[in-house]
């Protein structure tokens, strides 16, 4: 009896144990279904060779960009210079056309005089051929009128020639031969530029080419801004070098500090805002 009761108890205990299994034990989860979403640090770690090549590429791109910007600014200045030269040439062409028209009009005005004189002489000779005395008087009157018209025509020619060739000597183009001449011409053009507020009109007023002034500008700027550097460059000797070579040496003598002063004076219109024709 005791054995049967113990078996029944164990069976009951077993049954209760089997029923309580799903509630007491934790569910078994497969660890393979969980994946890490955070990236590994090893994936972002690049080799040192790749990093150095990328840095070199960025430096080269920056250098090319800087060179492109400098070239763009130089081209912009060149365009402005060419536009001013174009305006100057247009003014010269307009002046030439207007002077040619005036000469043609003067020529046309002076031409009909002899024709009228010939017509008057022919009419007087043909209309009164029957009367010798009247014919002679008409011929003498025609000759007097012809001589008077001839004198007027000569006076007109003389006045036109004086107007054509009587240009003031101050407006004639002069060739500078030394540094003092370059400085004197530069100051004259600068004064005209400050009055007229136009580079092309200032060059036209003094009958000087823009490129000629630009090639000798470093000499004048060195004498105005930094005359103490003239000892480094030396005096100009026409027997040893040309004026263009001396101007290039003056350009190379302009250091960064002097160039900053020059640019500041150009912005304030105290120097001619003209670009250099030399390169370092």
Curated annotation (Swiss-Prot):
Protein name: Coiled-coil domain-containing protein 106
Stated role: Promotes the degradation of p53/TP53 protein and inhibits its transactivity.
Biased composition (Basic residues): 152-168
Subunit description: Interacts with p53/TP53.
InterPro entries recorded: CCDC106 (IPR031591)
Main location: nucleus
Residues recorded as bearing Phosphoserine in the entry: 130
Biased segments, Basic and acidic residues type: 103-121
Gene symbol of the encoding locus: CCDC106
Biased composition (Low complexity): 133-146
Motif Bipartite nuclear localization signal, chain ranges: 151-164
Gene Ontology cellular-component terms listed: cytosol; nucleoplasm
Compartments (UniProt record): Nucleus
Superkingdom of origin organism: Eukaryota
Region (Disordered) residue spans: 103-176
